[in-house]
Amino acid sequence: MNNQQINYSVAIRTLGKAGVAYETLIHCLKRQTIVPQKIVVYLAEGYAAPAKVDDEVIVYCKKGMAHQRALTYDEIDTELVLLCDDDVYFAEDSVEKMLTALAAENADCVSANVFPNHDMRFRQKVLKGIFYGELPSFSKRFAFCIRKSSNYSYCNNPRDVMESQSCAGPCMMIKKTVNNSLGYQDELWLDQFPYTSGQDQIFAYKLYRYGYKLCVHYSAGVIHLDCKTGHVKDEVLADFNKRKIKYLEWYRSIYEPAGKMQKIFVSISYYLYWTWLFGLSLINVLPGRRRYKISNSVRALSEARKHVKSPEFAGIPKWEVKR
């Protein structure tokens, strides 16, 4: 690859709380074998700006994980944009590997795999499957598949680079025109919920359903340091919103785009998953722990079904899927 012919910029999403991890990120970016043309730090309004490490530019944006994901990067002139969280570590050739994969696979987006599900111990895989619906697969095509319940399956024996239907959100190289064509501004409903979740999966799966090619790179040398700048103060509310959002995510990305007959099948898939989770909640009560999960299961489903019928949610443009 001719390093002189590749131009890309970096967009960092932050609350300004990553500290040393943020400094490490900037230093890593400056040491890349292919140096970025520009580094723009998108800081949520209401937070103090981190101390500048180099020549990065700080731009304020609206607070909210979905709002930060929905940016159109008007401050960036290059077509290729490296989107990353503020607590990611890069090996010196990480970006070069991602750019090489982008060209070789004729992809529109390449995500670095920072959560190696396939490397978990057998016991962890079993527990993840039981409690979170995250199942291993032996797909030879996809790194991650989104199932009809909106849960994902991960390739248990991946190649270095694989096409995917979803990906982790902390680090991805994407074409700016592709990013801006997704209409992710329609997903800002996610930010109305405290302790929101699902914004990364919705972004990645929308990319796939809109006909773009998403790839996952398993050996790019990117590490998520996970500074955990968000803190859960209300565990009950966080659990409730996670369950409610899961239904809304399924409704937006799986149910709405489905055909008339497909809607029956995907509905059965989701309610089987919900029944499984409800059963786990009942079992969890036996030792006297987290009884709120039972009421949350029922109440979240009830409120989510009402929510999709509200004028505000029903008025959101539907996905224009191509596959």
Task: Please annotate each region the language model reported.
Residues 1-28:
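N-proximal low-complexity "stem/linker" segments adjacent to membrane-targeting elements
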Residues 27-36:
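Short, acidic, metal-binding catalytic loop of nucleotide-sugar glycosyltransferases
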Residues 81:
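Short aromatic/hydrophobic "clamp" motif used to bind/position activated sugar donors
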Residues 93-138:
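Conserved donor NDP-sugar-binding/catalytic core segment of glycosyltransferases
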Residues 131-164:
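Short, flexible, basic/aromatic active-site loop/helix in glycosyltransferases
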Residues 167-169, 191-203:
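Acidic donor-binding loop at a coil-to-helix junction in glycosyltransferase catalytic cores
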Residues 185-197, 210-235:
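Active-site donor/metal-binding and catalytic loop motifs
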Residues 238-245, 258-323:
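Non-catalytic, C-terminal membrane-associated alpha-helical segments of glycosyltransferases
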